């Protein structure tokens, strides 16, 4: 949900003012923690082995780490030092890495995107207009503005800079509530090959029975 925005803002405060290697390490640690907690189901899916769980978490964490270094480098650009500039650069770089890991290597691993938990929030209404890319970008954009609104280490030229950042972040969250959701029925049809619902627990016992899951 929307708690992701302040969480990402806090994370951003750790990487946008440090060197590339430190940002890499910070995001690698963050990424490993995130993915190990997100995909423990891979242990059961691979027969109870921890190695695939750890390996997949590490590979995905590398993408986070690369983004950390990229963010650190982009913050050295003069036009990225403003609140709007940083928000734009950070949103584009994060979504770019997010889409990269969703398609690479092989067919990618499109889990853990910032857009997914926003389905029941006002930002979820942006999905029909730009898909997960737009939703993730707006989440990051809001997070940067929130981070800048509480960044007292910078000497802003105007007293209203921080309040304006905060108000803008709030507005970006609230405004999508005014967007209509199309309730009309779509034309055409789609064929679904298979639908897999929940399985009986314990999972390994269910998997061991041939045809019970896929039959």
What is the predicted function of each stretch?
Residues 1-183:
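Membrane-embedded alpha-helical bundles of multi-pass enzymes
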Residues 179-215:
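Soluble catalytic regions of membrane-associated enzymes that act on cell-envelope
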């Amino acid at each position: 949900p929307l708690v992701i925005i302040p969480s990402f803002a806090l994370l951003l405060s750790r990487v946008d003012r440090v060197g590339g290697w430190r940002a890499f390490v910070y995001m690698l640690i963050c990424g490993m923690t995130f993915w190990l907690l997100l995909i423990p189901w891979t242990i059961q899916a691979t027969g109870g082995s921890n190695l695939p769980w750890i390996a997949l978490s590490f590979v995905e964490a590398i993408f986070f780490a690369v983004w950390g270094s990229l963010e650190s480098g982009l913050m050295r650009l003069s036009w990225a030092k403003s609140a709007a500039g940083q928000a734009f650069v950070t949103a584009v770089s994060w979504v770019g890495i997010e889409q990269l890991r969703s398609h690479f290597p092989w067919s990618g691993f499109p889990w853990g995107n910032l857009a997914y938990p926003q389905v029941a929030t006002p930002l979820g209404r942006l999905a029909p207009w730009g898909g997960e890319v737009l939703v993730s970008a707006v989440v990051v954009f809001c997070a940067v503005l929130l981070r800048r609104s509480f960044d007292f280490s910078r000497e802003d030229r105007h007293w209203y800079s921080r309040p304006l950042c905060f108000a803008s972040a709030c507005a970006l969250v609230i405004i999508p509530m005014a967007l209509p959701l199309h309730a009309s029925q779509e034309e055409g049809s789609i064929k679904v090959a298979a639908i897999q619902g929940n399985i009986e627990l314990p999972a390994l016992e269910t998997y061991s029975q041939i045809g019970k899951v896929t039959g």
